[in-house]
C-alpha cells in the first residue's frame, strides 16, 4: 500500500486493456492466404466437425480462422479476408473468415441473414 507522499510523487499507472484480436493490428479486417484447411472437433459437451483454416496474414501473423455457413470452396493458397470474433467451443479460434469476398464464395441458397454469409438476393 503506497503512502500519500508516494502517490503524489508518482500517480497510479492505468491498466492497459488487452486486445482480443492482436493479429488484426487495430484494423477491422485483414487479408491472408490459407496454409491449411481442415476440420476440428469442439469442446465438451458439443460434438461436430467444425470447418477451420490456418491463415497467414499480411500483418505477419499465422492464425486459425473459422469458416461459417454450410459448405465452402476454400483450399490451400486461397486468399481470404478475416475479421475478429471467436468461436466459443473451439479453443484458439479467435477469427472468422468473411464469406463472399476475395476467393471465398458466399453460401449457396441462403435466404435469411444473407449479408453475414455473402449471399446475393434470390431471383424473384
From Swiss-Prot:
Spans through the membrane: none
Region entry Disordered, spans: 104-124
Modified residues (3-methylthioaspartic acid): 89
Molecular-function GO term, any one: tRNA binding
Listed GO CC annotations: small ribosomal subunit
Pfam families per UniProt: Ribosom_S12_S23
Nucleotidyltransferase in keyword set: no
Entries under Gene3D superfamilies matching the protein: Nucleic acid-binding proteins
Keyword field: Methylation, Ribonucleoprotein, Ribosomal protein, RNA-binding, rRNA-binding, tRNA-binding
Top-level taxon: Bacteria
InterPro entries: NA-bd_OB-fold, Ribosomal_uS12, Ribosomal_uS12_bac
A single BP term in Gene Ontology: translation
Record keyword Ribosomal protein present: yes
HAMAP family: Ribosomal_uS12_B
Oligomer status and interactors: Part of the 30S ribosomal subunit. Contacts proteins S8 and S17. May interact with IF1 in the 30S initiation complex.
Function: With S4 and S5 plays an important role in translational accuracy.
NCBIfam families to which the protein is assigned, alphabetical: rpsL_bact
Family from the record: Belongs to the universal ribosomal protein uS12 family.
Protein name, UniProt field: Small ribosomal subunit protein uS12
Origin species: Synechococcus sp. (strain CC9605)
